Amino acid sequence: MCIRDRSKIVKMPDSNIIKKYNASNINVPSSMLDWMRSNHAGETGAVWIYMGAKCIFWNKKIKDMTKEHYETEKNHLIVMGHILPKSSHSKLLILWRILGFGLGFFSALLGYRFFCVTIQSVETFVEEHYQEQIDFLYKNSTSFELLRVLEKCCDEEVEHQIDAKFQKGNDKNTGFERFWSNLIGSGSSLAVNISKQY
């Protein structure tokens, strides 16, 4: 089970994070620019999900999960921001921050289980989103350096997904939780399509 000791979060300088992900000298192929724009926008939203959840400071379980997941998502954002030219960043970053914060705050406010359902749903979508890009790069034998970065990010997103599912417990999702998960999937898909263009 991919559950880390949450008491041992070590912060690293940005340059060390970029080295850790082997992302120092990567040129984004033109065929990947839209995808990478959506990745950067998505990681921005993810960071702000956890910033919103941090406001529910009285819930220790949410606080602990947020502490670990936030650091990983922040690393991903640093890496995506380094790889993607600033001129290619989404013009709607303020929107992704607001939506991410709102999602994190609202879901955490409804309790730990609901927050776990939310994170599991988000990460399920993110895994599929990254896997689509990984498959594309494999198929086209394009930028194996970028491929390795995306694989590492995807693996860490899957860890978050497994963590959230494990913490939620084995109970089946309620009808509302299933509706909420589907809504997150549809909303995430819409956000990706918009961020690819703007």
Where are these regions (language model features)?
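Non-heme di-metal
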Residues: R4-Y198
